[in-house]
Amino acid sequence: AVAEAHVPRSIRFKTKPQIALEQIRAAIKANVAPGTVLMDASYGTNSGLRRAITGLGRSYVAAIISTVKVRLVRENDPKPKRVSVGALARSLPKHAWRTITWREGSNAKLRSRFARVRVRAAPIRGEARFAEETLLIEWPTDESAPTKFWLATVDHDMPFRELVDLAKLRWRI
């Protein structure tokens, strides 16, 4: 089938995350100004890709799916239990949520309800421990459950609105 399609023998199959990582490495090699890597959930859910981007010295804001497992970072709990980001979001107290407006839309200001917490991606047994990250969660008031989740390695002190704006920036590309 490959020969019939006239695909050169030198071309090998690569996953989308592998291709993305090659593109990021090429940008670094070409001295493209460093910025935060933005990923949708098809890329962001891949822990290997996130780890590789961190290894290249780049920060990211990566959309993930609700079943991704994390451990909540707490000072008094050295080994918190693994929990899905969806379950963690539903367990947060009311005061953890803030309504944030991130930009003007075509008809109105874009706003929703968000929470952010410090987590570590919960590694698969035997995998090296992940660094602390920010979990950003969106739960619009008119929804029965949280709708969007991101893991971010940006500066922990980044203003909340700025973090939301960065997460939502991917939609403008």
What are these regions (language model features)?
Residues A1-F13, V61-R172:
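An anionic, glycine-rich sequence signature occurring as long contiguous blocks
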Residues A1-S66, N76-D77, L151:
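Polybasic low-complexity intrinsically disordered regions
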Residues A33, R172-I173:
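Intrinsically disordered or highly flexible coil/loop and linker segments, enriched in small
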